[in-house]
Amino acid sequence: MGRVIRAQRKGAGSVFKSHTHHRKGPAKFRSLDFGERNGYLKGVVTEIIHDPGRGAPLARVAFRHPFRFKKQKELFVAAEGMYTGQFLYCGKKATLVVGNVLPLRSIPEGAVICNVEHHVGDRGVFARASGDYAIVIAHNPDNDTSRIKLPSGSKKIVPSGCRAMIGQVAGGGRTEKPMLKAGNAYHKYRVKRNCWPKVRGVAMNPVEHPHGGGNHQHIGHASTVRRDAPPGKKVGLIAARRTGRLRGQAAALASKAD
């Protein structure tokens, strides 16, 4: 009898929790207050830092506390072009400069934005990954909503009071850079999840995987499996509608979708 395969072992035990003790903290806007609703607040970027497990760099921004004689430090997702010593302005009367935070109703149509709120005051939800940005499509003053285009291409309607940062998230093109060596991949996945290195099924013995064994590395049978296959057999192309290269009409439809 074969061994319990990798796909079966994944289902056992508790859900993996990523290592968060060395993270720098949650990246979000300031809490929405009177100053941002009616004017603007001025802050300064004190440093640009790397957050383990996150692709985009973070910016530590210091604001003057509105009520006490001290500084308020916030962590923002850094926009492309942001630098240490830069002055940031948050509020409805802030200028349209990369890194500033404004409500959507104060941002013109066609502007590139990032770290957009979903609900007023939730401190940023959409377009936060490295290189991501959203685009303001239109404003509807009748019901005070704005229509934005998300990085996925989907359109979304959100309240015009939701805040957004001008510009796109820094760190674009990060995934295009080759790993070059296994050590880089090791450090990448060490802070993310327990999924590396990943041995191919055809490189295993037949006792360890349905694709294993043979005098050369080959699957040896059709790689498609039925939907109700038992867990030890359910590897490969699960319940595939079709396999192989797209030809003819299917290829034309796929290119249209892209």
From Swiss-Prot:
The gene is RPL8C. GO terms for molecular function: mRNA binding; structural constituent of ribosome. Keywords: Ribonucleoprotein, Ribosomal protein. PANTHER family: LARGE RIBOSOMAL SUBUNIT PROTEIN UL2, RIBOSOMAL PROTEIN L2. GO terms for cellular component: cytosolic large ribosomal subunit; cytosolic ribosome; plasma membrane; vacuole. One of its GO terms (biological process) is translation. Residues 211-231 are annotated as: Disordered. PROSITE patterns: RIBOSOMAL_L2. This is Large ribosomal subunit protein uL2x. The keyword Ribosomal protein applies. NCBIfam families: PRK09612.1. The lineage of its organism: Eukaryota, Viridiplantae, Streptophyta, Embryophyta, Tracheophyta. Belongs to the universal ribosomal protein uL2 family. SUPFAM superfamilies: Nucleic acid-binding proteins, Translation proteins SH3-like domain.
